[in-house]
Amino acid sequence: MNKIFAAFKPRGLSSNSFLSTLKKKYKNKKAGYSGTLDPFAKGVLIVAFGQYAKLFRFLKKTPKTYKATLWLGVYSLSLDDQNIKKIQNIKEFDLAILKQIIDQMQGIISYTPPQFSAKRINGTRAYELAKKGIEANLKPCQMEVFDCKILSYNHPFLNIEITVSEGAYIRSYCELFARKLGINATLSSLERIKEGKFVYNNEKSLNVLKYINLKPNFIKDLNKLENGAKIFVEELEFHDEGDYYIETEKYFSIINIKENTVKYLLNKVEKC
């Protein structure tokens, strides 16, 4: 079974645990997901079964949009509503000040991922080390904030919708936002509502070619594609170097053109 869709991961489960439930549901062990969500977060997770599980690197998965609730005045080791160490009753902020900081935090932002994150350290998730009291050596990263807006502010809770690049951590954004206010803050909720063009729609199977980040190419002799025969650049409509997909009625293949040579990256993937 080839299938790709946007699933909705519930809060409290790791992405791997959630995938295991989907494997049982669809009775298919050959599956994968893209865009790990921390256990604390919920929302859109791209899931694929069968041959489609090999397509993640070709998908357009950015930008990503989240809804988040910032809890102002709270210090948490994990920057969420777990591991809370201190709660302060702070004065309510002028909405104009909050909007000003949000406007300042657009574009490229440097940050360090939170200790309680899904980042891997020598094969182990950082949050698994953090639970044991082991501090991971996480390298500084960059994220791009494309857009951010305030949805509501009911002190001490600030609800925002934020659109960011791949690899961004909203908890780190929350931490940086709080520093500019001169306070502590943590997330009380986080939901991913969109990943590229992927949105949750009851696990409806999608036409993967509409979500793939590749240009189409064309060949007159489609039998070559069906048989996995060697293809020469001269037989293709487009000759520029790069990755392309070529489709037949029932299948599609992904090829790479480099130094006047055509190489199959994936061949004869059945359409669903």
Curated annotation (Swiss-Prot):
Example GO molecular function? tRNA pseudouridine(55) synthase activity
| Active site annotation, chain numbering | D38
From the UniProt record, list the reaction(s) this protein catalyses. uridine(55) in tRNA = pseudouridine(55) in tRNA
User: What GO terms in the biological process aspect are recorded for it?
Assistant: mRNA pseudouridine synthesis; tRNA pseudouridine synthesis
Q: Which PANTHER family match?
A: PSEUDOURIDYLATE SYNTHASE TRUB1, TRNA-PSEUDOURIDINE SYNTHASE
The entry sums up its family as follows: Belongs to the pseudouridine synthase TruB family. Type 1 subfamily.
Q: Which cysteine residues pair off into disulfide bonds?
A: none
Write down the InterPro entries for this protein, in alphabetical order: PsdUridine_synth_cat_dom_sf, PsdUridine_synth_N, tRNA_psdUridine_synth_TruB
Please name one Pfam family that this protein belongs to.
Answer: TruB_N
Q: Which domain of life is it from?
A: Bacteria
* Keyword set, alphabetical order: Isomerase, tRNA processing
Write down what this protein is called: tRNA pseudouridine synthase B
Q: What does this protein do?
A: Responsible for synthesis of pseudouridine from uracil-55 in the psi GC loop of transfer RNAs.
Question: EC number(s) per UniProt?
Answer: 5.4.99.25
